[in-house]
């Protein structure tokens, strides 16, 4: 059956969360937002495209930094309200220059930094 981005469940702002996962390691890299057009652009181009809520514009991951996300697989969850994009990540995924945006853990009530920025 052909995929139609309009069949996804978007929030009131027309957005859906998209979790990026490294295709080789399974590591969760980041979470960002997509709208229907970002979904379509991602599937058409093979380059993961998000919607920047702060800039109110499309954000092709790595367009300015070179830290691109090449789409490997695109999955829809059971409620159709969240996406999982598995990617080939070039360089760090996080704007803090870390491999993953999930670099802080809470352990025994304390925040622990799990990874330092890449050089």
UniProtKB/Swiss-Prot annotation:
Keywords: Amino-acid biosynthesis, Cytoplasm, Histidine biosynthesis, Hydrolase, Magnesium, Metal-binding, Zinc. Gene3D superfamilies: Phosphoribosyl-AMP cyclohydrolase. Pathway: Amino-acid biosynthesis; L-histidine biosynthesis; L-histidine from 5-phospho-alpha-D-ribose 1-diphosphate: step 3/9. Its EC number is 3.5.4.19. Coiled coil: none annotated. Binds 1 Mg(2+) ion per subunit. GO terms for biological process: L-histidine biosynthetic process. It is found in: Cytoplasm. Zn(2+) binds at residues 78, 94, 101. InterPro entries: PRA-CH, PRib_AMP_CycHydrolase_dom, PRib_AMP_CycHydrolase_sf. Mg(2+) binds at residues 77, 79, 81. The keyword Hydrolase applies. The keyword Cytoplasm applies. It catalyses: 1-(5-phospho-beta-D-ribosyl)-5'-AMP + H2O = 1-(5-phospho-beta-D-ribosyl)-5-[(5-phospho-beta-D-ribosylamino)methylideneamino]imidazole-4-carboxamide. Its cofactor is Mg(2+); Zn(2+). GO terms for cellular component: cytoplasm. GO terms for molecular function: magnesium ion binding; phosphoribosyl-AMP cyclohydrolase activity; zinc ion binding. HAMAP family: HisI. Homodimer. Belongs to the PRA-CH family. Catalyzes the hydrolysis of the adenine ring of phosphoribosyl-AMP. This is Phosphoribosyl-AMP cyclohydrolase. It comes from Ruegeria pomeroyi (strain ATCC 700808 / DSM 15171 / DSS-3). The gene is hisI.
